[in-house]
A protein has these predicted regions:
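Short glycine-rich catalytic loops that host catalytic nucleophiles or stabilize transition states
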Residues: 399-405
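A short loop-to-beta-strand scaffold at the N-terminal edge of the catalytic core in hydrolase folds
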Residues: 65-73
């Protein structure tokens, strides 16, 4: 069934039913009245600009936890549902290449532009937006509302790539009755933070601020990319970049992809007892992860722009596909996407308070981890990809490493990734 689908119950009923996840605060309600609901998308080509595979189509779904959600869909609505959540800086569009194969296996597959991204509207576009709108659990509420709006009570598999794994993981933790399987891509599942046990706080370790201070002492001074993306400077940099938006995405995809020279023969980062030692260990990573302190991300990417020959011969990320990201982010801006970093890193209060409600919970649905073999992101995990699944899961089904893929395996090697996902669905 195409077109929009009316939710089975009102927004008031939905919010009451979702009270176990925490109600909206008064501040959230006030901010909701001030959100920007219009964007210059009517001036753009159709979503995907004629690069979508046959059978993958865009659709708008209204009344989704205050949002109108733009999404891609494939397969017949009414079949078992697979929900694909993108990461940063991506869109639902990033799943286009795996959707047909999953749909052909008998599923209805949807990939939304998440809150803050793309053509999904209804969120506050200001830098000082209410942080509670971007907490992990409110973004889980977005997904529960979308599932309901589509006429479903269960999701056969929820998949999260990069930042999307945070939403997907918590969806599986708080609603295992609804989200029956979990796959995370390029990032291990998020486990709820721990509370002190037995009246004694856990000692040792260091804070993000202490690590950042040690990065600043390196020669040349460095900073963690997450600390950068959480800053107002990043928001301003992305509004005034020296290159075109398409050129930024070309360089960003290249540097984090499987062909980039610095992404070969990776060894996982070693856990270190002090911030000073950790800063030195992290400095092994390329500058797109541990950045020079005097450069923003656009300036960093200028130095990594691939050659014209590479661009002309790049089959997994054509110029037409690159231009889709360029045009969509030019229209939407970056502020909403950056809120996902900002409110996790500089406004921990509401987010951590909600997450601590689930301290001690494990992921109790069948779970799979997929990562590119040439992805530094997967090697930032203590112990690397091989360590995923040792704690926090009760039904971990394994890790699948994808060769000749970096941080974008669903776009770099879609046939392999879709086969892994379908195999997981059919075997559990």
């Amino acid at each position: 069934m195409k077109g929009t689908t009316r939710p089975e119950f009102s927004r008031r009923e939905f919010l009451a039913g979702a009270s176990a996840l925490g109600g909206m605060t008064m501040a959230s309600a006030a901010a909701a009245a001030q959100v920007t609901t219009m964007a210059p998308f009517e001036k753009l080509p159709p979503y995907g600009n004629n690069t979508l595979p046959v059978g993958v189509t865009p659709r708008l779904v209204p009344n989704v936890n205050g949002l109108t959600v733009n999404m891609l869909e494939a397969g017949t609505q009414g079949r078992p549902l697979v929900l694909l959540l993108h990461g940063f800086p991506n869109l639902g569009y990033s799943w286009r290449k795996v959707m047909p194969a999953i749909a052909d296996a008998g599923y209805y597959v949807v990939a939304p532009d998440c809150r803050g991204f793309g053509r999904t509207v209804g969120w506050d576009k200001s830098w000082d937006a209410d942080p509670t709108a971007f907490t992990t659990l409110n973004m889980v509420r977005d997904q529960i509302a979308l599932v309901s709006a589509l006429g479903y009570r269960k999701v056969d598999m929820i998949v999260g790539h990069d930042q999307g794994q945070l939403m997907a993981s918590y969806a599986a933790i708080v609603r295992p009755d609804m989200f029956l399987r979990l796959t995370t891509v390029s990032g291990a599942a998020a486990i709820p933070p721990s509370l002190p046990f037995g009246g004694t706080a856990r000692g040792g370790g260091y804070t993000a601020a202490e690590l950042d201070a040690e990065f600043a002492k390196l020669d040349p001074p460095r900073r963690d990319y997450q600390e950068y993306w959480a800053s107002r400077q990043a928001d301003e940099d992305m509004k005034h970049m020296p290159q075109s938006m398409s050129d930024f995405f070309r360089a960003f995809y290249y540097t984090k992809g499987g062909e980039f020279p610095a992404n070969q023969n990776l060894t996982p980062l070693r856990p270190m007892p002090t911030a000073r030692e950790a800063a030195a260990e992290n400095a092994r990573m390329p500058e797109y992860y541990v950045m020079r302190r005097d450069r923003g991300m656009p300036a960093t990417m200028v130095a990594f722009m691939p050659s014209k020959d590479y661009i002309a011969n790049c089959k997994w990320f054509t110029q037409a596909e690159c231009d889709v990201y360029g045009q969509e982010y030019t229209a939407s801006g970056w502020t909403g996407a950056l809120h996902n970093y900002r409110h996790r890193r500089t406004a921990f209060g509401p987010n951590i308070a909600e997450q601590l409600t689930f301290s001690g919970r494990t992921i109790d649905v069948p779970a799979l981890f997929i990562a590119g073999k040439q992805d530094w992101g997967a090697n930032r995990i203590a112990g690397g990809p091989a360590a995923v699944g040792r704690t926090g899961y009760t039904k971990f089904m394994g890790t699948q490493l994808v060769d000749r893929a970096g941080h974008w395996p669903q776009e770099e090697q879609p046939e392999i990734v879709s086969k892994q996902m379908v195999g997981f669905l059919q075997s559990t």
